[in-house]
Amino acid sequence: MISYLKGSPIEVIKNTNNRVILVLEVNEIGYELQIPSKLGREISQEKLDTIQIFTHVQIKEDQQILYGFSTTAERELFRQLISVSGIGAQSAIALIDTLGLEELVQAIVTGNIRILSQPSGIGRKTAERIALELRTKLSQWRKMVGVTVTSSAAMPSLEILEDIEMTLLALGYTNEEINKAISTLSQDNLMLKNTNTEEWIKEAIAWLSQGT
């Protein structure tokens, strides 16, 4: 089993299936790894001489595929995702790529189906299955690897969350910005007791406006 590869990034390309491929030279051998597009952009921008990529090997009848990730936590999350029935490697990478590590874990732990349904190819039923099968596992795992997630007990109801997200997304805010706003507001015990969705949205916009 290959745990990681350390070497020189030769090129980052998109293949005919629109998948991001990193060619990594290790001891004069070029390895092809499929990686999240975000990692591909980082490698292209940083132009480092040597990088370390954590790997997952998938062996099929006719080929061996290497998947690469920037951290062991990201790789482990990928492995957890592909353990879910109906979730293949491409869907797992799409989830990690679209949502990022912390946001994806938070969406699973809190059962936020709307967020989990955002990546292309992930329908509502699939998102529900991911949350159902991984919620307990990831609640324990994220503590061991140090992934920070706002506790579901210290957040507004799922109905309020979805209304906030729908409204703020329509206003042009990103998922990352929205989650930060909700996380910050959820630290206020008075806000947590507030069931008025409009006030949550108003406070979230006010908080987000401070950073603009």
Swiss-Prot record:
GO terms under cellular component: cytoplasm; Holliday junction helicase complex; Holliday junction resolvase complex
Chain spans, region Domain I: 1-70
GO MF term set: ATP binding; four-way junction DNA binding; four-way junction helicase activity
GO biological process: DNA recombination; DNA repair
CDD domains, per the entry: UBA_RuvA_C
SMART domains cross-referenced by the UniProt entry: HhH1 (SM00278)
InterPro entries: DNA_helicase_Holl-junc_RuvA_I, Hlx-hairpin-Hlx_DNA-bd_motif, NA-bd_OB-fold, RuvA, RuvA_2-like, RuvA_C, RuvA_C_sf
Location of the protein in the cell: Cytoplasm
Keywords: Cytoplasm, DNA damage, DNA recombination, DNA repair, DNA-binding
Coiled coil: none
Region described as Domain II: spans on this chain: 71-149
Pfam family, one: HHH_5
Keyword DNA damage on entry: yes
Annotated region described as Domain III, given as residue ranges: 160-212
Flexible linker: region residues: 150-160
Subunit structure: Homotetramer. Forms an RuvA(8)-RuvB(12)-Holliday junction (HJ) complex. HJ DNA is sandwiched between 2 RuvA tetramers; dsDNA enters through RuvA and exits via RuvB. An RuvB hexamer assembles on each DNA strand where it exits the tetramer. Each RuvB hexamer is contacted by two RuvA subunits (via domain III) on 2 adjacent RuvB subunits; this complex drives branch migration. In the full resolvosome a probable DNA-RuvA(4)-RuvB(12)-RuvC(2) complex forms which resolves the HJ.
Similarity comment: Belongs to the RuvA family.
Biological function: The RuvA-RuvB-RuvC complex processes Holliday junction (HJ) DNA during genetic recombination and DNA repair, while the RuvA-RuvB complex plays an important role in the rescue of blocked DNA replication forks via replication fork reversal (RFR). RuvA specifically binds to HJ cruciform DNA, conferring on it an open structure. The RuvB hexamer acts as an ATP-dependent pump, pulling dsDNA into and through the RuvAB complex. HJ branch migration allows RuvC to scan DNA until it finds its consensus sequence, where it cleaves and resolves the cruciform DNA.
Domain notes from UniProt: Has three domains with a flexible linker between the domains II and III and assumes an 'L' shape. Domain III is highly mobile and contacts RuvB.
Protein name as annotated: Holliday junction branch migration complex subunit RuvA
Biological source species: Crocosphaera subtropica (strain ATCC 51142 / BH68)
